[in-house]
């Protein structure tokens, strides 16, 4: 984590007291935007936990989301090797871009960013089904209406079909079945108020444990 002592040691002389800051989604890895910060905006960001920039066009401090409410919650930040730019990891609330897209670089999605968006769509369908019933019938909504037993059954079925496709050495079939398995696994995780990020964190822990032994 970048502390006050460390950010005061950044190279502020290169760009007239400003540092370019790359904003990245802390879970999906999607690059959201580029902004500029001075020492005052960094101090406010550290104090409030929400990203504040220095606007070059307005010539003042600018809290991201001050008018739209689409703020950027600070998760972590890192200087680059030359200490003249920043990578800031955030959890965005709402759209980041003023054009109502998740990223100002839309639609430059990485593979994992797509997976994160798919998970968000599944979550929306789950919440809508929970609060309004299955008014807008879809396969995902039908699964949530059926309940955990049906969802778990589908994960088991798709897992078996994935294994059989692998044994048959059919690459196309394996990709198809693995896609079905991952989709139904995401549905299951969302049903239990979990997500793929939780799985990744567990894998990180296991990886660290293996390195120690």
Swiss-Prot record:
N-terminal signal peptide = none
**Compartments (UniProt record):** Cytoplasm
Q: What class of enzyme is it?
A: hydrolase
| Phosphoribosyl-ATP pyrophosphohydrolase: region residues | 115-213
Q: In which pathway does it act?
A: Amino-acid biosynthesis; L-histidine biosynthesis; L-histidine from 5-phospho-alpha-D-ribose 1-diphosphate: step 2/9; Amino-acid biosynthesis; L-histidine biosynthesis; L-histidine from 5-phospho-alpha-D-ribose 1-diphosphate: step 3/9
Record's catalysed reaction(s): 1-(5-phospho-beta-D-ribosyl)-ATP + H2O = 1-(5-phospho-beta-D-ribosyl)-5'-AMP + diphosphate + H(+); 1-(5-phospho-beta-D-ribosyl)-5'-AMP + H2O = 1-(5-phospho-beta-D-ribosyl)-5-[(5-phospho-beta-D-ribosylamino)methylideneamino]imidazole-4-carboxamide
Q: Which GO terms describe its biological process?
A: L-histidine biosynthetic process
Q: Where is the region Phosphoribosyl-AMP cyclohydrolase?
A: 1-114
UniProt cross-references to NCBIfam families, sorted A to Z: histidine_hisI (TIGR03188), PRK02759.1 (NF002747)
Similarity comment text for this entry: In the N-terminal section; belongs to the PRA-CH family.
Q: What is this protein called?
A: Histidine biosynthesis bifunctional protein HisIE
Species per Swiss-Prot/TrEMBL record: Blochmanniella floridana
């Amino acid at each position: 984590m970048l502390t006050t002592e460390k950010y005061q040691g950044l190279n502020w002389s290169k760009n007239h007291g400003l540092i370019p800051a790359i904003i990245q989604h802390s879970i999906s890895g999607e690059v959201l935007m580029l902004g500029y910060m001075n020492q005052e905006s960094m101090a406010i960001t550290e104090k409030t936990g929400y990203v504040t920039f220095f606007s070059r066009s307005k010539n003042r401090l600018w809290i991201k989301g001050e008018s739209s409410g689409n703020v950027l919650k600070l998760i972590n930040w890192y200087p680059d090797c030359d200490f003249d730019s920043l990578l800031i990891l955030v959890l965005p609330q709402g759209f980041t871009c003023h054009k109502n897209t998740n990223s100002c670089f839309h639609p430059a999605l990485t593979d994992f960013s797509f997976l994160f968006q798919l998970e968000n769509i599944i979550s929306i369908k789950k919440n809508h089904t929970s609060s309004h019933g299955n008014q807008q019938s879809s396969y995902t909504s039908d699964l949530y209406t059926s309940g955990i037993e049906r969802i778990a059954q589908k994960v088991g079925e798709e897992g078996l079909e994935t294994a059989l496709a692998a044994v048959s050495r059919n690459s196309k079939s394996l990709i198809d079945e693995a896609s079905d398995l991952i989709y139904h696994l995401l549905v299951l995780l969302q049903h239990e108020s979990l997500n793929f990020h939780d799985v990744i964190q567990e894998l990180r822990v296991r990886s660290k444990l293996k390195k120690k032994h």
